[in-house]
Amino acid sequence: MTLGKLIRALFLQRPPTRKLLPSWSLPKVLEALAKPPFEPLAEASLRDITIKTVFLVAIASGQRHSALHALSVAPGHIRWELGGVRLIPNPSYIAKNQTSSSSLVEIFIQPLSAHSSIGADKVWCPVRALKYYWHRTKDKRSGNQLFIITKEPFSPASRDTISKWIVAAIQAAGPEALAPGNVPRAHDTRSVATSWALFNGVSVEEIHKAAYWRSPNSFISFYLKDVPAAEPSFSRAALSAAAGTH
């Protein structure tokens, strides 16, 4: 038997399993991020502002932590537009499922206020958090990378550090936010965000485009989680629907 046939045989005997339930509750995490030490933003530490901003951007965009790591403040890479903010990563970044000939990655995030008349919902707005973070860090940053470590010398944050911040946001919700026997992972934001978006009216094709999957089947087969729908563009559905369950 060739090695390829042996691997295939083992795969068929023990196919990979996929958890249907998310390992943590997005509504509970959002609820935690709406309270001290994360709010009010004006009183929050740089670390807490960073944790909240990174998490909200991850959820609103459905991007991997590697894409967040590639976000840049170089001229033209953060565009504050009327309908939201457009983020363009470092040109050297290529999403996992892109090819070198693919068009440049652009991440567009809408403000939550554009889709909710409830003033209190602003605490979950990724555009608000990102703008506050950008102003708070612009005098500390020596390079062009958006996310920097929260202590001197304020050097560019690594991918691992960004992952740890995402996990810290999840852990801020306490053990009751975790499904039994689960450990929070930064990569889970991708599946949870896109699942909320799908269950709340965003087509698979839109999710495929926003999150840069090779095909919709990748999302359906490996990332779709069994999350409840709450109420009927990507960032709007992922955040506003989850926040609406409180």
Named regions from a protein language model:
Residues 1-246:
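Extended, non-catalytic subsegments within catalytic or DNA/protein-binding/adaptor domains
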